[in-house]
Amino acid sequence: MGMRKSGAKADAQKSHVLAPGTACVEGARVVVDDEEMEERAESSNIDDSPLIGADNTSADYYFDSYSHFGIHEEMLKDVVRTKTYQNVIYQNTFLFKNKVVLDVGAGTGILSLFCAKAGAKHVYAVECSQMADMAKEIVRTNGYSDVITVLKGKVEEIELPVPHVDVIISEWMGYFLLFENMLNTVLYARDKWLINDGVILPDKALLFLTAIEDAEYKEDKIEFWNNVYGFDMSCIRKQAMAEPLVDTFDPKQIVTSDVLVKKMDISEMASGDVSFTAPFKLIAERDDYIHAFVAYFNVLFTQCHKEISFSTGPRSKGTHWKQTVLYLDEVLTICEGEIIEGSITVEPNKKNPRDLEITINYSLNGKHCQVSLTQHYKMR
């Protein structure tokens, strides 16, 4: 998975573990002067042993990535994300008053703190990363130790001190909505602990697809590999094409309509529903070129007094999720009113279910362009 602009959560979701002092830059040149190199050498007595042994699984890398403070800082500073959850809880205290709440993937414990302040009887905050230790201290510092219990471990492996909970709350969404596959953990918790008429927040999620013109960046990101200082490195181009890019873009780049490709009801869906194939039709809204498909998602809290939602779409206020860009092998020339038809298939990677396999079949039978192609993408 690529990035135009580096971010803490972005780097962690892409690289999982960055050693101290490691530079992680996409499409840029890093220059380290002699003085900085000397400073690094002098600091080599710092314990730089890997956080995870070589025999650990990809799941361990995933959880370790969320031990980094920068990831949580980025998420907390995402005003759209955090204020939406805060508004859901504070404006709908009837959902939490005297209720037992389970916070899945609690991180710093911010959602648990919101729930406790809204009158929850007790909150169980489950966090598998080292951040659980910080969450315990945060809870204690803010005077909620009698209301919030932080449990360190995987949801699938822990046992709650209670047989059931009234509410499950979680911020499980990844890039492209489903990257990292945390939703299945929420569904596991739902099936094991949530009472029959219990509340799950959020309870709906919508995944959309559109198409954009992006000639300038595709040239810089993809076509660059065809001629690198006179050498053919196009084998890397093939890999770059298969790697979705997470970034924002100007809404003026949108060429087609938007189409809903997946609607999820978190209260009722099965874990297998995270894999799906959906047809789509995108209608050109002007004459232009198309260089990429773009995916984004909306999240809904429909069990509130009044439905609350937010969007990660290009026309909405930016979030740390940005959008996911899937570049096309061939540039499409399209005229207003012409239709791109196809299907999108999304499924977890078999070896590492936190990664995503995305396949798009698409065709255009237009005035200037006739194509029928299949492209495969790997989000990791």
List each model region and its residues.
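Class I SAM-binding transferase module
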Residues: G2-V104, T108-R380
